[in-house]
Amino acid sequence: MITAIAFTGSAVTDMPRARAFYEGVLGLKPAEEMAGGKWVEYQVGGGTFALTTIDPRWTPSDQGTAVAFEVDDLGTMVETVKRSGASISMEKSETPVCWIAIVHDPDGNKVVLHTRKAA
């Protein structure tokens, strides 16, 4: 029986470049670094997000799975991402329940920026 999501992770090819994006652009704070810096964890809203270069079989991809980060101010975050030069595949868009944008980290992994509307 599944009881929780242990972590969500994204494979990257260049850890310093990835950390510059996730920490410098998105503002995540590293919580733990393991395996000689090949695994970095961030605590985000009660969950764990990890970056890894630990296994060459786990490769970056812009297909399929993505992590979605809840943000306070989606417009400001999208502008910050634009200034960084990162790729944006979906500008800030409205749905019935939220605002959403899709950006890509330096390896092309999808990163969803999300703000839920007030109920």
Locations of regions flagged by a protein language model:
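Short glycine-enriched loop/turn motifs at secondary-structure junctions
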Residues: 1-4, 58-64, 94-95
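Core segments of cupin and vicinal oxygen chelate
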Residues: 9-49
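N-terminal beta-strand motif that seeds the catalytic metal site of vicinal oxygen chelate
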Residues: 1-17, 46, 65-67, 117-119
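Short hydrophobic/aromatic beta-strand element in the GNAT-like acyltransferase core
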Residues: 41, 68, 100-102
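Short secondary-structure boundary/capping segments
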Residues: 31-32, 40-41, 57-60, 92
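Short, charged/polar, Gly/Pro-enriched secondary-structure boundary elements
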Residues: 46-51, 59, 107-111
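Vicinal oxygen chelate
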Residues: 78-119
